[in-house]
């Protein structure tokens, strides 16, 4: 049934008695034509206007007073046209079809045809007949997530909405406003009874409003919550919640907002996801290492700038051997580009020469790359000699740089610092893979290392099973506003993933050579000579390896004795396989470093790239030259140059026990070899002799006496 509206004329009261008003009729295209059975001459003086809202009435069933006002597209004023356009734009932007009252004219027929086309379009999308359909996408005609084509031709649709609401909020979105959630369309659920909304018929002397079909006031959105707009507008009630509901629905303030298709929505979602993930810390898979210790040098750490300067200098110094034509390192002297032997130099001193100090500007120079820290100076001592030592020890140049100089901007792969653990006040930096140690040393120790370097290199060449520490480089860094720091790079004595259950620092002396009570309570305690004797157990190497060990100790001690060096010690780490499942201790080697002014280690990982496992004692070495440094383009050592792995580091950097009651895994090496028998040590010897007696075994003795006592003690604890 059609909705009948009545209009009230504004005219001369004197003529009102002669005029009879009749209901208007609906013409084509929804145009309303008033029927006035009076003199046509009077029609020009009549102006039709909408009737005022009737007084509210209360219904016992729904407690709702509704007034249905049909919006029409008339040409009376420009304001009416703008209102109608805003309403139609809202309907089109939300891709929803708002039904008109039932009518016998062609308006409802056109609406029903358009609804049928929408259903057919949705079926085609579900069947995959349209090219822009995404798999498993749910097609909802009235949903904002649907990318169904918009209906742009529905300019003459009738909309049952509250005009006052539209005037209050011109961008009001009919499909997104759920201020009346009680109105639910149960077309998708036929089992659930549908409760028709009670309508109210109000009759006055001049107005008749009828609503007979409740379904015409609902929005057809396929089972979703519908919205009714026949709620009466009360000027005394605030309607600010309409704006709140509208904003909460996620709609734009503009009625002509741009709709996104499926590909655009997926791209936008991907960008938002990447933005969220960029603020999250990256997930780092850390390999469990039981011998990890020290503090990671994070960005902002006091040693952060020092670490970056050290890494920048090492990359430039060690990278010279990897220089290529046209690169920065290609401009350095040719003698640093290739691996060379001492015999290739006419003068022996030229092999141990050090280049000039290089200045690193922040912006970079022709010889250096740009860096993030301030300007600093860097000195590389004896690069030819240390590079040749790295070759003999089987250390690949690329692996060496990756272990030490692979810190990222976010702090990943940074060095680990063990600050000032010993009496010397030195700092220790461990590489992120725990292969190498960077130790700061004083000037006199750096000078001693340069002085003994020729004898040390010759000893390593002739003694592949040497237990002496393995040095890989000596450098000096001087920040622009700071003091210069000298540091040496060595191998870690405990590179294994196995837990070191016990540690012993043995010198062969007795005075002051016992761990304190407080130290013994710590899991990282390093025991000393008296503790080892009280252990009443020996190191079981087997008869053959025992003799090899004693012979090698004699040769090493002979070298140190000739260099006037004393106060060194044998560091022993013991791993018990039957205690494999015990939790790792919080900080390993800390007590060892506290007892030692130097922490050098002869160990290295057997699996280093470019490494050849060759052993002179067993005769199973390979002199094919396959182990030469493949990172250089220049000459390499001849085929008779042999790369050796110590016989006491064949089993993951250590040696397994042979005999004894329990299975044990030993890690052995001599440490603290950069200590001369200087005037200070002589004064210490005199003082302790007077205090404890001449017959007492004290540490500060002459190099000859120290070497003899050291060898004698070790021969008694090895089986």
From Swiss-Prot:
InterPro entries: PInositol-4-P-4/5-kinase_C_sf, PInositol-4-P-4/5-kinase_core, PInositol-4-P-5-kinase_N, PInositol-4/5-P-5/4-kinase. Residues 47-261, 579-638 are annotated as: Disordered. One of its GO terms (cellular component) is plasma membrane. Gene3D superfamilies: 2-Layer Sandwich (3.30.810.10), Phosphatidylinositol Phosphate Kinase II Beta (3.30.800.10). Its EC number is 2.7.1.-. Phosphorylated at Thr-262 by pkgB. GO terms for biological process: 1-phosphatidyl-1D-myo-inositol 4,5-bisphosphate biosynthetic process; chemotaxis to cAMP; phosphatidylinositol phosphate biosynthetic process; regulation of Ras protein signal transduction. This is Probable phosphatidylinositol phosphate kinase DDB_G0267588. The lineage of its organism: Eukaryota, Amoebozoa, Evosea, Eumycetozoa, Dictyostelia.
